[in-house]
Swiss-Prot record:
It is found in: Cytoplasm. Binds 4 [4Fe-4S] clusters per heterotetramer. Contains two stable clusters in the N-termini of NUBP1 and two labile, bridging clusters between subunits of the NUBP1-NUBP2 heterotetramer. This is Cytosolic Fe-S cluster assembly factor NUBP2 homolog. GO terms for cellular component: cytosol. Its cofactor is [4Fe-4S] cluster. InterPro entries: Mrp-like_CS, Mrp/NBP35_ATP-bd, NUBP2/Cfd1_eukaryotes, P-loop_NTPase, YlxH/NBP35. PROSITE patterns: MRP. The keyword Zinc does not apply. One of its GO terms (biological process) is iron-sulfur cluster assembly. Keywords: 4Fe-4S, ATP-binding, Cytoplasm, Iron, Iron-sulfur, Metal-binding, Nucleotide-binding. The lineage of its organism: Eukaryota, Metazoa, Cnidaria, Anthozoa, Hexacorallia.
Length: 270
């Protein structure tokens, strides 16, 4: 049987999904900062936002006032800089206004996602990070079904230390098992608070729930990312935090997580 890989993904080396069981856990923040960190390591990176009803990636990457252009092979992603090593695609670029709401039924959403996966000309890139909506819905099933022939490297599951968020991650793990998507690991976001004055990290919430869940479910634990007010400010400005806050515990955590992801994906390649 002939295996057909979507045209836009034929030169993509590694595909990683970013999932969360519920909203508000910082999934898009993790997706953007992982993309920046991979970029800063010298990789060519694509960031695809398929959260159709809440497209926050364009603003977080400081590219929201750009337009998507067409080429002979499809859509050209919006690049963050002239080196064209970090490209972004989101429905946010296709809306007339930032205030426009996407009020679509499932079939239209699914068709849009299929078009994103097949018609975006990513070119020869090392990583494609796919930021998904929270939960498990039609959008997730559409993504997984259309990526089957690409054999994605796996999914990163984002949670916070609270019990409610952690219990929702269990459903994400079950979803990955049912759809045969490997789990690259769990990231515990908002784990501790970094003082903006002394950079000391204090556990204002509970801590360690993500790591305990990873052990229980026998999936890798990638690390904890603390709350850092400076990181929040940089995200609001659409900046790569790792260039500006090299001594931040949050930067150290993200870089450590990226190292683990790079190691896992390189093993998949071999």
């Amino acid at each position: 049987m002939c295996v057909v890989v979507p045209q836009g993904l034929r030169s993509v080396k590694h595909i990683i999904l970013v999932l969360s069981g519920k909203g508000g856990v910082g999934k898009s923040t993790v997706a953007t900062q992982l993309s920046w960190a991979l970029y800063n390591q010298g990789n060519k990176v694509g960031l695809l936002d398929i959260d159709l009803c809440g497209p926050s990636i364009p603003r977080m990457m400081n590219v929201e006032n750009n337009d998507v252009h067409q080429c002979s092979d499809g859509w050209v992603p919006v690049y963050t800089g002239p080196d064209q090593r970090l490209g972004v695609m989101s429905i946010g670029f296709l809306l007339h206004s930032k205030e426009d709401a996407v009020v679509w039924r499932g079939p239209k959403k699914n068709a849009m996602i299929k078009q994103f996966l097949s018609d975006v000309c990513w070119g020869d890139i090392d990583y494609l990070i796919i930021d998904t909506p929270p939960g498990t819905s039609d959008e997730h099933i559409t993504v997984v079904e259309n990526l089957k022939t690409c054999h994605p490297d796996g999914a990163i599951l984002v949670t916070t230390p609270q019990g409610v968020a952690i219990s929702d991650v269990r459903r994400e793990i079950t979803f990955c098992k049912k759809t045969k998507i490997p789990v690259l690991g769990i990231v515990e976001n908002m784990s501790g608070f970094v003082c903006p004055h002394c950079s000391e990290c204090t556990n204002v919430f509970s801590k360690g729930g993500g790591e305990a869940l990873a052990k229980e479910c026998e999936v890798p634990f990638l690390g904890c990312i603390p709350l850092d007010p400076n990181l929040t400010m940089n995200i609001e400005d659409g900046k790569s935090f790792s260039d500006l806050l090299s001594n931040s515990p949050a930067v150290e955590s993200v870089n450590s997580i990226v190292t683990k992801i790079s190691h896992a994906t390189s093993q998949n390649q071999t």
